[in-house]
């Protein structure tokens, strides 16, 4: 059985202040996109795991096996399984590759063994793997509240195009939050104008990302785009309405810039419950 494991963008992220437990209260917009990994699952004589395209992923202690262990504990099903993962989402890119793989694994196991677990049950298991893992059981577009674990599904799909720009080095979320200053937190509650409040903290740690954002803004100058950081990075993205591509002048210019800059083009996708995300590896 084969399943698409989509990347996730934080279209915006507002820091609303530090809580009594030491964590920051946030409001963020999650969006699943058509760029992602491919997971394959089969029953086997013994547990096995094969990773393609990325040797940095741990074989024995990754989010897929964590989900497998949780599923087995919850259902009592311990049949050996074989996982094969084709990785496209870079490790530490801020695109929630590990969280997406974990959620996809839970869904896949539920399908494979026909256990009939509800989305709510799967979401509850997903919470034990990662803060944003439950998001993937939404429609594919949602608000993240609290520390990001409270997911409010949004039904509308933003018709935008995203161009992703990866970095060779990731940013740990804990490191980004450790250097947050009170002045970084949003004063406005107007989500229409929200940006990523983690940008300045991350840029204090990574001057190269700040310079790369400036380079992208200069490169895309003359086209109505937004350039931002997703989550705590280290992926930068360019966002623009897909309608621009119907303008021949813009369309030609956009394709030239993408070819020159090495960006990866992707689009928003939705999940049609009770199915999983459509297998779209290209936008």
Swiss-Prot record:
Swiss-Prot/TrEMBL keywords: ATP-binding, Isoprene biosynthesis, Kinase, Nucleotide-binding, Transferase
Keyword Transferase: yes
Pathway: Isoprenoid biosynthesis; isopentenyl diphosphate biosynthesis via DXP pathway; isopentenyl diphosphate from 1-deoxy-D-xylulose 5-phosphate: step 3/6
Binding site for ATP: 90-100
Pfam families cross-referenced by the UniProt entry: GHMP_kinases_N (PF00288)
GO biological process: isopentenyl diphosphate biosynthetic process, methylerythritol 4-phosphate pathway; terpenoid biosynthetic process
Catalytic center residues: 8, 132
Any one GO MF annotation of this record: 4-(cytidine 5'-diphospho)-2-C-methyl-D-erythritol kinase activity
Presence of the UniProt keyword Lipid metabolism in the record: no
Coiled coil: none
Signal peptide (from-to): none
Reactions the enzyme catalyzes: 4-CDP-2-C-methyl-D-erythritol + ATP = 4-CDP-2-C-methyl-D-erythritol 2-phosphate + ADP + H(+)
Enzyme Commission identifier(s): 2.7.1.148
Record's function text: Catalyzes the phosphorylation of the position 2 hydroxy group of 4-diphosphocytidyl-2C-methyl-D-erythritol.
HAMAP family to which the protein is assigned, alphabetical: IspE
NCBIfam families: ispE
Family listed: Belongs to the GHMP kinase family. IspE subfamily.
Record-given protein name: 4-diphosphocytidyl-2-C-methyl-D-erythritol kinase
Organism: Chlamydia muridarum (strain MoPn / Nigg)
């Amino acid at each position: 059985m084969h399943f698409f494991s989509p990347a996730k963008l934080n279209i915006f992220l507002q820091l609303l202040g530090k809580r009594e437990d030491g964590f920051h209260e946030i409001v963020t917009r999650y969006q699943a996109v058509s760029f992602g990994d491919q997971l394959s699952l089969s029953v086997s004589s013994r547990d096995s795991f094969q990773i393609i395209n990325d040797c940095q992923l741990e074989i024995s202690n990754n989010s897929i096996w964590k989900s497998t262990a949780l599923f087995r504990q919850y259902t009592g099903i311990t049949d050996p399984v074989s996982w094969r993962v084709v990785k496209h989402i870079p490790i530490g890119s801020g695109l929630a590759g590990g969280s997406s793989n974990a959620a996809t694994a839970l869904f896949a196991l539920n399908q494979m063994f026909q256990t009939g677990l509800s989305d709510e049950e799967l979401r509850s298991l997903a919470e034990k793997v990662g803060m944003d893992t439950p998001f993937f059981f939404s429609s594919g577009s949602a608000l993240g509240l609290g520390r990001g674990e409270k997911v409010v599904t949004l039904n509308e799909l933003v018709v935008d195009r995203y161009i992703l720009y990866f970095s060779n080095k990731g940013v740990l979320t804990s490191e980004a939050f450790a250097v947050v200053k009170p002045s970084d937190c949003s004063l406005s509650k107007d989500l229409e104008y929200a940006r990523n409040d983690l940008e300045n903290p991350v840029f204090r740690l990574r001057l190269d990302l700040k310079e790369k954002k400036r380079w992208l803004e200069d490169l895309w100058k003359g086209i109505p785009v937004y350039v931002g950081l997703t989550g705590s990075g280290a992926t930068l993205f360019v966002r623009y309405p897909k309608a621009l591509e119907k303008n021949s002048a813009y369309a030609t210019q956009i394709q030239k810039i993408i070819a020159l800059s090495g960006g990866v083009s992707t689009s928003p996708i939705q999940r049609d419950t009770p199915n999983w995300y459509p297998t779209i590896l290209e936008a």
